[in-house]
């Protein structure tokens, strides 16, 4: 994948991404922007806010509307997956304008912004008045805290991340999530440090944390010198391991979070469900994902109850759905079937189309295909390079 082919609007794993700006002034060793030439780069605007929102409208009401009703769809929109919308003034100004225009033009749905920047009250106030839920994923690896210079540039340290969460908690429509990545052995906290950290996260009104390992594979900077030097154990993992994750550290972090009553998740989709008070949308609670990404999470019982309701549901209009999906994918009617809790596609499928079907039906059905063609720079936990039927 190259920067030239990054779509303006695309269906990622947990959300629809909207990317009017490419390039991030931060320089994080593990970031997928590195191989794209977009790391430690001046952000380049390729679409005005007006163009962006028109593209979102076209996307939601175009081909996608054949399988998901844009009037009721609650798939979040994430603004800025190939930049940081907070790290420069023009980016912040664009974000404010995009939020305002979205509120004018599309039905209410959650918005997501992933950032390592410092939030300020004026920015939060500017985006809060439109009534859209806004979820700030505050990315904090704790690398600086551990003395490992994995990140360079104008990014938040732990204290600033916690201050950001406090500011967000004072708004009417916004919530903060700690995006804990990469979660690897070299950054492992002691049990005492974890107890202190979880306590600080909770008292800062962080809604929850999402713990993500070091992703590897196509589009990921595995030859980055800092990764090889600072994370030698993680980089020495077997070549076929698409995510390097500190299981021992996770055991301690999970136990600490459970003891403190602090939600700790392995999937962003679980955090989004918790924030919205809804069942998880992609089926993380379904096999084969539940053993590693659902059951081990420090998830409140009330949220597990919401997902249990979704798990018990059945799809009743199989023929209509199969025909709808076949038309969406341009396949013959006999190549799509709905049976025994599964939507089965008898062909390869593009990753963005697979994600669209997950967003529309993953809460109700397992989505199976002959394989998934990767379309972005990193692998998702559901596709993992190609989910076989």
Can you name each region flagged by the protein language model?
Residues 1, 6-8, 12, 209, ...:
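Generic preference for hydrophobic/aromatic residues in regular secondary structure cores
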Residues 2-135, 350-351, 355-389:
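Conserved Radical SAM active-site core
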Residues 7, 219, 223-389:
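C-terminal accessory extensions appended to soluble enzyme cores
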Residues 13, 36-38, 149-151, 180-181, ...:
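Glycine- and acidic
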Residues 48, 190-193, 317:
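Alpha-helix capping and helix-coil boundary motifs
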Residues 53-62, 66-234, 240, 249:
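Conserved AdoMet/S-adenosylmethionine-binding subsite of the radical SAM
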């Amino acid at each position: 994948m190259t920067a030239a082919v990054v779509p303006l609007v695309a269906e990622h794993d947990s959300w629809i991404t909207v990317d009017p700006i490419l390039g991030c002034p931060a320089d994080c060793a593990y970031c997928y922007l590195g191989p794209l030439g977009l790391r430690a780069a001046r952000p380049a605007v390729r679409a005005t806010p007006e163009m962006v929102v028109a593209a979102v409208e076209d996307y939601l009401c175009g081909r996608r509307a054949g399988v998901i009703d844009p009037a009721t769809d609650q798939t979040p929109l994430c603004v800025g997956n190939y930049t940081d919308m907070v790290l420069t003034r023009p980016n912040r100004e664009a974000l404010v304008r995009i939020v305002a225009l979205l509120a004018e033009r599309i039905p209410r749905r959650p918005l997501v912004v992933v950032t390592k920047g410092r939030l300020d009250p004026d920015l939060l106030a500017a985006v809060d008045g439109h009534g859209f839920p806004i979820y700030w994923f505050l990315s904090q690896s704790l690398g600086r805290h551990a003395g490992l210079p994995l990140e360079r540039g104008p990014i938040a340290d732990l204290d600033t991340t916690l201050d950001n969460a406090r500011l967000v908690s004072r708004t009417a429509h916004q919530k903060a999530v700690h995006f804990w990545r990469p979660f690897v052995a070299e950054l492992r906290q002691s049990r005492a440090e974890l107890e202190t950290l979880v306590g600080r996260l909770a008292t800062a009104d962080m809604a929850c944390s999402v713990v993500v390992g070091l992703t590897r594979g196509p589009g990921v900077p595995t030859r980055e010198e800092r990764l090889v030097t600072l994370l030698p154990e993680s980089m020495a993992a077997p070549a076929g391991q698409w995510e390097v994750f500190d299981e021992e550290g996770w055991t301690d972090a999970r136990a600490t979070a459970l003891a403190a009553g602090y939600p700790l998740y392995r999937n962003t989709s679980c955090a989004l469900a918790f924030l919205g008070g809804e069942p998880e949308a992609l089926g993380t609670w379904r096999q084969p994902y539940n053993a590693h990404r659902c059951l081990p999470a420090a998830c409140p019982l009330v949220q597990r109850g919401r997902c249990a309701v979704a798990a018990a549901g059945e799809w009743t209009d199989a023929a209509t759905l199969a025909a709808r999906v076949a038309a969406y994918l341009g396949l013959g009617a006999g190549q799509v079937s709905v049976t025994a809790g599964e939507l089965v596609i008898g062909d390869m499928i593009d990753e963005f189309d697979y994600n669209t079907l997950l967003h529309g039906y993953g809460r109700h059905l397992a989505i199976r295909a002959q394989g998934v063609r990767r379309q972005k720079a990193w692998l998702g936990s559901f596709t993992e390079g190609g989910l076989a039927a």
